[in-house]
Amino acid sequence: ITPKMSSDKYYLWDYYKSNRHPQTKKILRKKEKFMRNISDQDTILIPCTAELYRMKETDSLLIWKRTLLNDVCPVNAIVANDGSSIATFDNWYSTGYGVNVFVVYDETGNAKKTYKLEEISPFPLNDYMMSISSLHWNNAERYIDNGKIEIVFVTENNRQITRIYNTKNLAFEK
């Protein structure tokens, strides 16, 4: 997995381009000077991507390369042993928040299902340990076979519930 990348100048370029900055003479002069010296490379934002390889003897064969739904980069990613599905968890800098807390991709790298934490959590969101940027909700995730993912939810008080997700049905088991 390769995280989202940008040049050092990208966000300042984006800020100046948006005209959300104060319209003072001093700032407008800075903007004009900055914009004269910016290159096309400075304005490119490269999204988070993933590559899946199959190992064959001593060689590796690229199966697919895709852009992931995560804004910056998933915190964790797991792959079924047969490559039939891939799951990503959370977003870097914002664990537990957003629409891509849990994403299931198929064997070709296409997103099949996305979840917010409130859609999958067996606990109220207030039960999880919180920091300024994140909700710390899971203790572990792993494939228990090629079609099932075990996810361990853990609260701030160390209560745990393990849920099994079926990647074929795209649903949690009861």
Report each predicted region and the residues it spans.
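Secretory-pathway ectodomains
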Residues: 1-174
